């Protein structure tokens, strides 16, 4: 070394001036004192003091002796360490110590002294700090690089520094430590794994949480040395991740935590590590993939992370894990989504597609977390989620699992409240989620009580928060109601109705409890408890809890009084909240935090507590309406036109007047309503009248000034007002005034005298008014009414056609285009019906003669006089009026008894009327009467005829009505076990004999053994039986079989001696029996009870006669294939909020696009149904399949497609499909199959007349066949000759002995049913007008397209020729048959393709738009739609030559 030359040989130690020798002979205190002086000397020296350096060299060596390095006293050691640090500074760059071992001892000694830094409160701390500062500044430890044991020294130093750092240290300490450690990494040749571990261990979460300062120190060190240390970090991860050498470090198990920390510190540290993660994401080890996914979720989702944009391959690879096979991995990905959406909105687009798939994940937890992720992001900022993401939440509100549905509904509710109610993000955001309110209320259509209760809770807490101040709450409700769509409004009205009903049930229960206990009262209480239980979740538990609650009410008078106050009509909202609080407080038990009993009672109280509406609320609502009327409301700001707001406000008040009539009892409210009566807007005045009718019972006593102001207005309205206002004015007088007889007389007399048949315009209101007076006060005007009906109504109005109708080929026109004379005739028919319903007896035989008149109208197709003056649209209206009138009268027992079977059968044919709107409205009237249990069961049999309807929408609606009516009756029987005497009129299975009888008398069923006609019969029977047989409750299959067997032992009561008629009856029985046998495995069991057959329809069974003959032709056997009926789809959809019946579709070419879940087919041989089918007729392969039956030419299948000119006759109809098909067709169908691949495995095509034997090869025939038909249609289109007049009833079958071979191709479109919401019941007239309005709206879209189609059908020479030679003549529905003229050219026999048929085609093509994206399919699709169209010709009952332009 440099100093060796000047070393004294004697080794004498020179001490600084004033310092005596330091040895073990002196005391510790003295030693410390002397060492301090030495420290001072070294501190003051610098590197340039060569003399001093030489002078004190031996002292430097002496201080490094073991005596000092191992001295027991810490103060001595500290001072020596300070000296040594200065010595390294002074003698740098060469240290005075030559021995490597000595150097190691010295540095290990200094390292040990650094532990003293830990105690910042120590008096010696400054000296420790000096020591640290000195060695850091001088980089003294760098001397150790040359030592073999350098790694041990550095590792010890790092460990020491990381262990001593704490929050007592200031920034300088931290800085010096970083300087010291970074110099070792940056200037050294290598970083050992052990040294790296001492740094990285501080990043592991457990250590990080224990010593935050050590973590910060490691972080600062890594940032400072990033470039130098990166290769060593890369090597470490490479060894662990890629080579699996976990033994190289104790930190191997924390690699993923470390990667995250290192990435957060400096992403450059991991430049070479991240690609390794991509490899790990594809590992076969589930746990390993999960760890990597968790890690990357944090890295991608971190607030300022740019990893996704910097490393796109890794991001794409990560997104792939959303579809991982391992559930926890998918779950992790979904949870990550919300952080990613919140912190990186730019990645939302990438995530959307993956979240879409996961929102349909089979795992409930994943679907649930998709909702949570999207809603969490949306609640932070609605702009973070796009419409697609919100739609995923929307879809999940219909999830099969309650937990997912609940999360989705609550999520949407919270989003709605924040952005729509509180306008947290302005109007644009509110607009973006404007659909939420409608969607949430639509869920009220679900059958599940849990869903409905949640909707009620959401409405009360999020949509119209009950804790708002009254005025604010009513304003909120007012504008909500004005902006809801029609279905949501219906749902909200239904909600209030249900709550009101439950409130009354609880009130009845309380009344029963107060009565003295008897067996009868106990039974009544139990019955009432059962009814209330059905309105609560989990009926099993609810029943027990309700029994317990009933006991509490009997025992605890205070709770009973609170509940009485709660259900009282005068209960205010504030009072209601108080009552609920008191009852729950009394029932609660502090020792039992989770109390299921209390929870159930809370559900009940929530449903019955009037938290929104009381007298004060109604008053506030009326004021809000008045503001809109005066123009002082902020309607425009709320995005509602003033007229719409006023109308909606009155509608809202009208609904509330049903559920909360007492709340309207205030002078202010009635005065405002009186002002509304005088407004020009008819709807507003109409609603005001209805409100008076519902709420005015106390006006006469309590508000005389209102009474005197109201009476003249009512008189005026009933005489001169619009018809609907006249109707409600009469009902108001009846409800409000005690002197109603006088008032009625004052109105009736002048109206009666002024009736003038020549003044048609002014006849409608008087007829309406007189009709309603007759309904409400039949005895008061019995004589004048009878003569009025006989002379004026029948002779002057109905039997007279004063003006010729407009010539038109349309079958239906809007109200404003209907001739005034027809409008008067319709009101005349209604007036007669009201008169009869008021009388409720047939003593004067008025009912009999009226029914005769109505059936004559039906028989003459609406032209009662048969003079041919009435236009076709007017005839349609009159047929509808007559059919509806019979259905209305049938609801009154005294008239039901006198309706003959012939009249009933003729009325039934209205459901197959040639005019779509007649069928639609008649079906709705029928459903309304049935669902209220007013119509006898035989009227449900009429629904079977809907199987013949060519329009899917009508079939779907009929199917839903059937399901609903069967369910209603079964529920009623469950609830009223004691009504066994009514079993014959209520048990749905008893519809089977009526259906069999009706089908045996169907005018289309002419030839007993005709295969095509029998197939029709089978379709109609299956339409009813499929739903009845869906569940084999109480062995009902055997019961139905027994019923059918019994019918075969009787005769037709309508013509017991008519052999042909009885043979038809038995043949229909055999069809039914074959369906039952093919669809049930339990039909052969013993029937639970012996069925009773209706005596009006069947004679008593002949004990001596055993009818075991099989009446079916042998060929029919092949049309019955086994398979269980599946109606789950239909059952699930009955109450779904689908588009309302008759909803107009988007383009004029489409008539009835039903964007709802596909309902099943009505085919006994149908293998099942496609769930969630695409809206395309193209998907209904099997819908067009029944023309594959009974082929006389089974061998010609392949020829058919190759020669497009083959006649229809040659098209194969055999059920047995050829196994081989063209590759070309196969291709087309494969494309098609892709679209339904999810459904196909379930075997659920919607084939109506096809068994399981119907293989794909058959489906693959259709594209070519469609092309052929399409070409024919195009050719016919060009000819475009006018259609020839046809008959009403079903399409005539041309003359000739044989059966038409084309007929099978004419019956298919009836098959594809789509679910539709059964329309809610409304006021009769109101409902009819609304229905007619809807149908008009719709018909416009159809009129234009029909003519060409009708002509096309009329002009196909090949098909007509075939028919003319092979069809059976047939009677038109509703009147005697008129045979086609022999001279008439055969090609025109098929003329009147009905409107429904033509528009069916349009419908199909509209539905096809959905599939346009996939071009290989779409061409065939539209052809398939067209073919379906063609095929359905045979199903239209009534026909007209010129309906095409309707």
Swiss-Prot record:
Source species of the chain: Mus musculus (Mouse)
Biological processes, Gene Ontology terms: cell division; lens development in camera-type eye; mitotic sister chromatid cohesion; negative regulation of cell population proliferation; regulation of cell population proliferation
Residue ranges, compositional bias (Acidic residues): 1421-1431
Compositionally biased tracts (Polar residues): 1137-1155, 1353-1370
Function: Regulator of sister chromatid cohesion in mitosis which may stabilize cohesin complex association with chromatin. May couple sister chromatid cohesion during mitosis to DNA replication. Cohesion ensures that chromosome partitioning is accurate in both meiotic and mitotic cells and plays an important role in DNA repair. Plays a role in androgen-induced proliferative arrest in prostate cells.
Annotated Basic and acidic residues bias: 1172-1184, 1196-1212, 1223-1241, 1263-1272
Biased segments, Low complexity type: 1156-1167
DNA-binding region: 1247-1259, 1285-1297, 1370-1382
Locations listed in the record: Nucleus
GO terms assigned for molecular function: DNA binding
Biased composition, class Basic residues, residue ranges: 1243-1252, 1308-1317, 1339-1351, 1436-1446
Tissue-specific expression: Expressed in prostate.
UniProt record similarity statement: Belongs to the PDS5 family.
Organism phylogeny: Eukaryota, Metazoa, Chordata, Craniata, Vertebrata
Sites bearing Phosphothreonine, chain numbering: 1253, 1365, 1368
Keywords noted in UniProt: Acetylation, Cell cycle, Cell division, Mitosis, Nucleus, Phosphoprotein, Repeat
Modified positions (N6-acetyllysine) in chain numbering: 1136
GO cellular component term of the entry, any: nucleus
Stated name of the protein: Sister chromatid cohesion protein PDS5 homolog B
UniProt keyword Repeat, yes or no: yes
Residues that bear Phosphoserine: 1140, 1162, 1166, 1176, 1182, 1191, 1255, 1257, 1281, 1356, 1364, 1367, 1381, 1415, 1418
Listed InterPro entries: ARM-like, ARM-type_fold, Pds5
Gene name as annotated: Pds5b
């Amino acid at each position: 070394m440099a100093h060796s030359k000047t070393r004294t040989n004697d080794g004498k130690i020179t001490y600084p001036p004033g310092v005596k020798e330091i040895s073990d002979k002196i005391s510790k205190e003295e030693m410390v004192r002397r060492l301090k002086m030495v420290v001072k000397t070294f501190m003051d020296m610098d590197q340039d003091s060569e003399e001093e350096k030489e002078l004190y060299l031996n002292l430097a060596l002496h201080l490094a002796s073991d005596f000092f390095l191992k001295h027991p006293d810490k103060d001595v050691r500290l001072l020596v360490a300070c000296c040594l640090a200065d010595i390294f500074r002074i003698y740098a760059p060469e240290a005075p110590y030559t021995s490597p071992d000595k150097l190691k001892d010295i540095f290990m000694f200094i390292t040990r002294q650094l532990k003293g830094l830990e105690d910042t409160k120590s008096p010696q701390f400054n000296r420790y700090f000096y020591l640290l500062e000195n060695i850091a500044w001088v980089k003294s430890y760098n001397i150790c690089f040359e030592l073999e044991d350098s790694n041990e020294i550095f590792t010890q130093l790092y460990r020491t520094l990381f262990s001593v750092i704490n929050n007592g240290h200031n920034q300088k300490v931290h800085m010096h430590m970083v300087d010291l450690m970074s110099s070792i990494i940056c200037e050294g040749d290598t970083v050992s794994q052990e040294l790296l571990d001492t740094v990285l261990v501080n990043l592991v979460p457990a250590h990080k949480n224990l010593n935050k300062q050590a973590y910060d120190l490691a972080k600062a060190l890594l940032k400072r040395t990033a470039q130098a240390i990166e290769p060593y970090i890369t090597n470490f991860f490479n060894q662990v991740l890629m080579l699996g050498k976990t033994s190289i470090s104790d930190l191997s198990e924390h690699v993923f935590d470390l990667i995250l920390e290192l990435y957060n510190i400096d992403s450059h540290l991991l430049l070479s590590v991240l690609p390794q993660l991509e490899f790990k994401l594809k590992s076969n080890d589930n746990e390993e993939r999960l760890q990597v996914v968790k890690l990357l979720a944090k890295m991608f989702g971190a607030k300022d992370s740019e990893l996704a944009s910097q490393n796109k391959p890794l991001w794409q690879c990560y997104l792939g894990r959303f579809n991982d096979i391992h559930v926890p991995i998918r779950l992790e990905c979904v949870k990550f989504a919300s952080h990613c959406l919140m912190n990186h909105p730019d990645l939302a687009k990438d995530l959307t597609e993956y979240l879409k798939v996961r929102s349909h994940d089979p795992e409930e937890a994943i679907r649930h977390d998709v909702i949570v992720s999207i809603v969490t992001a949306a609640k932070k900022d609605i702009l973070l989620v796009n419409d697609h993401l919100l739609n995923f939440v929307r879809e999940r509100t219909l999830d099969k699992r309650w937990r997912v549905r609940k999360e989705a509904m609550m999520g949407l509710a919270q989003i709605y409240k924040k952005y729509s109610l509180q306008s947290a993000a302005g109007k644009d955001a509110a607009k973006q989620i404007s659909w939420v309110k409608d969607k949430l209320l639509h869920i009220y259509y679900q059958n599940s009580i849990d869903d409905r209760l949640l909707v009620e809770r959401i409405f009360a807490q999020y949509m119209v928060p009950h804790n708002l101040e009254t005025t604010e709450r009513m304003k909120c409700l007012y504008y909500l109601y004005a902006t809801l769509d029609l279905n949501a409004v219906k749902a909200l009205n239904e909600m209030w109705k249900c709550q009101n009903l439950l409130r009354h049930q609880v009130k009845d229960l309380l009344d029963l409890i107060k009565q003295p206990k008897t067996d009868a009262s106990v039974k009544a209480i139990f019955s009432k408890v059962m009814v209330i239980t059905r309105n609560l979740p989990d009926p099993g538990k609810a029943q027990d809890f309700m029994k317990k609650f009933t006991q509490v009410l009997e025992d605890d008078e205070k709770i009973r009084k609170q509940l009485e106050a709660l259900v009282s009509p005068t209960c205010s909202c504030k009072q209601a909240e108080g009552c609920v609080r008191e009852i729950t407080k009394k029932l609660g038990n502090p020792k039992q935090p989770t109390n299921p009993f209390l929870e159930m009672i809370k559900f009940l109280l929530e449903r019955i507590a009037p938290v929104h509406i009381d007298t004060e609320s109604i008053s506030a609502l009326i004021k809000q309406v008045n503001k809109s009327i005066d123009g002082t409301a902020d309607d425009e700001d709320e995005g509602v036109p003033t007229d719409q707001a006023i109308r909606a406000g009155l509608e809202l008040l009208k609904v509330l007047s049903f559920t909360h009539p007492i709340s309207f009892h205030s002078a202010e409210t009635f005065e405002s309503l009186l002002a509304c009566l005088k407004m020009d807007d008819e709807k507003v005045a109409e609603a005001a009248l209805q409100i008076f009718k519902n709420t005015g019972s106390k006006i006469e006593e309590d508000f005389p000034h209102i009474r005197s102001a109201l009476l003249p207005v009512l008189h005026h309205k009933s005489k001169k007002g619009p018809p609907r206002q006249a109707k409600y004015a009469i009902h108001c007088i009846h409800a409000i005034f005690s002197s109603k007889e006088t008032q009625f007389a004052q109105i009736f007399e002048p109206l009666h005298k002024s009736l003038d048949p020549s003044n048609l315009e002014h006849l409608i209101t008087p007829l309406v008014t007189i009709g309603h007076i007759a309904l409400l006060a039949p005895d008061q005007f019995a004589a004048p009414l009878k003569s009025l009906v006989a002379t004026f109504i029948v002779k002057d109005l109905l039997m007279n056609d004063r003006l010729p109708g407009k010539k038109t080929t349309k079958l239906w026109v809007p109200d404003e285009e209907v001739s005034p004379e027809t409008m008067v005739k319709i009101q005349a028919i209604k007036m007669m019906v009201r008169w009869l319903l008021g009388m409720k007896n047939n003593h004067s035989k008025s009912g009999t003669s009226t029914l005769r008149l109505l059936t004559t109208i039906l028989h003459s197709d609406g032209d009662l006089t048969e003079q041919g003056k009435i236009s076709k649209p007017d005839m349609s209206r009159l047929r509808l009026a007559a059919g509806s009138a019979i259905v209305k009268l049938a609801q009154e027992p005294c008239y039901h008894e006198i309706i003959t079977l012939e009249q009933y059968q003729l009325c039934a044919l209205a459901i197959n009327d040639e005019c779509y709107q007649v069928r639609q409205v008649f079906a709705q009237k029928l459903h309304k009467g049935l669902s209220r249990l007013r119509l006898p069961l035989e009227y449900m049999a009429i629904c079977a005829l809907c199987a013949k309807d060519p329009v899917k929408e009508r079939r779907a609606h009929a199917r839903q009505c059937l399901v609903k009516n069967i369910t209603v009756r079964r529920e009623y029987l469950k609830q009223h076990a004691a009504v066994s005497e009514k079993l014959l009129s209520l048990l749905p299975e008893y519809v089977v004999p009526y259906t069999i009888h009706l089908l045996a008398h169907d005018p289309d069923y002419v030839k007993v053994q005709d295969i095509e006609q029998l197939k029709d019969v089978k379709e109609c029977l299956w339409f009813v039986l499929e739903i009845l047989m869906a569940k084999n409750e109480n062995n009902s299959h055997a019961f139905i079989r027994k019923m059918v067997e019994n019918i075969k032992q009787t005769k037709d009561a309508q013509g017991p001696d008519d052999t042909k008629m009885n043979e038809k009856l038995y043949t229909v029985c055999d069809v039914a029996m074959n369906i039952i046998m093919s669809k049930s495995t339990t039909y052969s069991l013993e029937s639970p009870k012996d069925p009773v057959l209706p005596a009006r329809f069947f004679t008593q069974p002949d004990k001596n006669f055993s009818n075991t003959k099989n009446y079916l032709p042998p060929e029919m056997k092949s049309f019955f294939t086994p398979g269980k009926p599946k109606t789950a789809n239909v059952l699930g959809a009955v109450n779904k909020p689908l588009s309302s019946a008759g909803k107009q579709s988007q383009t004029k070419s489409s008539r009835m696009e039903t964007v709802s879940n596909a309902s099943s087919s009505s085919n006994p041989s149908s293998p099942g149904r496609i769930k969630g089918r695409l809206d395309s007729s193209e998907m209904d392969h099997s819908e067009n399949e029944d023309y594959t039956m009974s082929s006389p030419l089974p061998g010609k299948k392949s020829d058919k497609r190759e020669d497009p000119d083959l006649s229809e006759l040659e098209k194969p109809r055999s059920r047995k499909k050829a196994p081989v098909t063209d590759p070309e067709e196969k291709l087309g169908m494969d494309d098609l199959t892709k679209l339904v691949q999810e459904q196909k495995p379930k075997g659920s095509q919607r084939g109506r007349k096809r068994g399981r034997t119907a293989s794909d090869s058959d489906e693959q025939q259709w594209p070519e066949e469609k092309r052929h038909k399409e070409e024919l249609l195009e050719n016919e289109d060009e000819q475009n000759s006018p259609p020839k007049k046809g008959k009403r009833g079903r399409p005539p079958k041309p003359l000739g002995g044989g059966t038409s071979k084309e007929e099978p191709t004419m019956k298919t479109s009836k098959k594809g049913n789509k679910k539709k919401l059964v329309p809610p019941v409304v006021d009769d007239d109101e409902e009819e007008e609304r229905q007619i309005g809807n149908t008009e709206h719709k018909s416009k879209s159809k009129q234009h397209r029909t003519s060409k189609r009708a002509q096309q059908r009329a002009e196909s020479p090949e098909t007509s020729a075939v028919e003319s030679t092979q069809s059976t003549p047939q009677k038109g529905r509703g009147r005697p048959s008129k045979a086609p003229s022999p001279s008439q050219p055969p090609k025109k026999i098929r003329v009147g393709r009905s409107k429904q048929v033509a528009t069916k085609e349009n419908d199909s093509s509209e539905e096809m738009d959905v599939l346009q994206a996939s071009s290989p399919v779409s061409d065939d699709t539209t052809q398939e739609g067209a073919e379906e169209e063609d095929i359905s010709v045979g199903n239209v009952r009534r026909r007209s030559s010129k309906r095409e332009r309707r």
